[in-house]
Curated annotation (Swiss-Prot):
This is Integration host factor subunit alpha. PROSITE patterns: HISTONE_LIKE. The lineage of its organism: Bacteria, Pseudomonadati, Pseudomonadota, Alphaproteobacteria, Sphingomonadales. SMART domains: BHL. One of its GO terms (biological process) is DNA recombination. This protein is one of the two subunits of integration host factor, a specific DNA-binding protein that functions in genetic recombination as well as in transcriptional and translational control. Belongs to the bacterial histone-like protein family.
Amino acid sequence: MQADIPTLTRADITDMLYHEVGLSRADSAKMIEQMLGHITDALKKGENVKISGFGSFILRDKNERVGRNPKTGIEVPIAPRRVLTFRASQLMRQRIIKGA
């Protein structure tokens, strides 16, 4: 990631809720933590998460495969695993393109 690109943090989102919605800082932080907790719990249970107009968090199972050590060239088995991917919605993609 490039150093000159800013990052939106939990604290930033909490501050936005405080200023724009009028919630207290404590309530804003609690709301963010609860929302992220619900998303995390759903993903832990193996559920995909779809937020309309934003995107989807999708769990994918990767099968075992053979990889190669780039330094030695020796083949190495890569264990099966579950990965989390994010796919932005079409609306989000359009908003990003228009904003660029």
